[in-house]
Amino acid sequence: MEILRASEDYLESMLMMKLKHGYIRSIDVAEHLGVTKPSVTYATRRLKESGHITMDKDGLITLTETGMAVAAKMLDRHKTLTAFLIAQVGGQAVLG
């Protein structure tokens, strides 16, 4: 199933919130991404429909196995890119 780039960003942010706080709340995702709460509400509805997350009666979000796989892939990709860019800048500083 094809997932939108914006949805990948939301899932990655949700994983980061889970790792940082131990739980995922919509308000934390909104603050982390710099978006409005209604934007997060819209995204979570889409992610629930696609089976990437569940939400309990208190509004706490849980990544499903599928959602966790996408989120972990995105987080790993960003960590790899960050490490690469830091290595490139570090090499240029030495050469410069």
Language-model regions, residue ranges each:
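Amphipathic alpha-helical dimerization/coiled-coil segments
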Residues: K79-G96
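Generic detection of well-ordered alpha-helical segments
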Residues: E8, A72, D76-A83
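Canonical helix-turn-helix DNA-binding module
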Residues: S26-K57, E65
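N-terminal helix-turn-helix DNA-binding core of bacterial DNA-binding proteins
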Residues: E2-V35
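Basic, amphipathic "hinge/linker" alpha-helix immediately C-terminal to the N-terminal HTH DNA-binding motif
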Residues: G59-R77
